[in-house]
């Protein structure tokens, strides 16, 4: 009997020429039905704050917003699929940069010498009109990435409200900043731990990277600026040190979700090779780096995932970085680039 009533209601709706949009507003019942919009409530008052705190930290997982969200695939899980087509495979890009420039400097050695500083370099970043690595990556995201990011943002604002969204994103970036400060204290031989730093060392993120830190030695640079004068971009790298005996540009990342494969880190490899290429040709540095390391740390303290990049892999990502840089330059010429929301 209830099924017949339900079928009758459906026929009435079709005969009334209800649109798809109108049908979405109908609340069905087995005994009666009504049509109307739900009463608007304050989404910030009813939000599950624990749930969305974890969600925001998962999406805004990195210091730079090139990775916010850090994954088109993660966005698809949050927002639903956009289309039935498969996401393009980055490995299928066969384009060649028009203006090729080598990532490695043939005039430099990757072996330490007497002129190398005993104290890690920490060159301040000079704010100027030269674009940063983060800005280039932000401004050259695919249209699908931009769309998914904006859709995610609007959904979060709907749930949290404008003030709630700002508060959560601020907390995420503050947490990332403190994580990097704690690592700097650990890796700097001349640093003395303050009470605040000691508290930071007890965080899950620091616990997560303990097994990685055991293999890190010979720190050459920490939170240090690099500039590529020929290709005209700047950046602020996290660390240059030896990992398992090989000198690397190290990038520390945080994530709520496991990222056991380098493909899961999305634009992070491009960030690493961009810093590497700039540093290898920056006169402030006397040495050369040919390897990269992305370390993804987890808040719950579970072991971080290290993603090592040898010289061959770095060269492959360098080609992709040059393409993104050319795309940025072309957009700038066409005056289509807007001021970035975040910078390094």
Curated annotation (Swiss-Prot):
HAMAP family xrefs: MGME1
Protein family (similarity comment) = Belongs to the MGME1 family.
- Disorder this protein is connected to according to its UniProt record: Mitochondrial DNA depletion syndrome 11: An autosomal recessive mitochondrial disorder characterized by onset in childhood or adulthood of progressive external ophthalmoplegia, muscle weakness and atrophy, exercise intolerance, and respiratory insufficiency due to muscle weakness. More variable features include spinal deformity, emaciation, and cardiac abnormalities. Skeletal muscle biopsies show deletion and depletion of mitochondrial DNA (mtDNA) with variable defects in respiratory chain enzyme activities.
Q: Quote the annotated effect of residue 253 to A.
A: Abolishes exonuclease activity
Q: What are the catalytic residues? A: 238, 251, 253
The protein's location, in the record's own words, is: Mitochondrion
What more the UniProt record tells us is: This protein may be expected to contain an N-terminal transit peptide but none has been predicted.
InterPro entries given in the database record: PDDEXK-like_dom_sf, PDDEXK_AddAB-type, Restrct_endonuc-II-like
Output the Gene Ontology terms for molecular function.
5'-flap endonuclease activity; single-stranded DNA 5'-3' DNA exonuclease activity; single-stranded DNA exodeoxyribonuclease activity
Q: Which protein is depicted?
A: Mitochondrial genome maintenance exonuclease 1
Q: Which UniProt keyword terms apply here?
A: Disease variant, DNA damage, DNA repair, Exonuclease, Hydrolase, Mitochondrion, Nuclease, Phosphoprotein, Primary mitochondrial disease, Progressive external ophthalmoplegia
Q: What GO cellular-component annotations does this UniProt entry give?
A: mitochondrial matrix; mitochondrion
Domain of life assignment: Eukaryota
Q: Which residues carry this modification: Phosphoserine?
A: 343
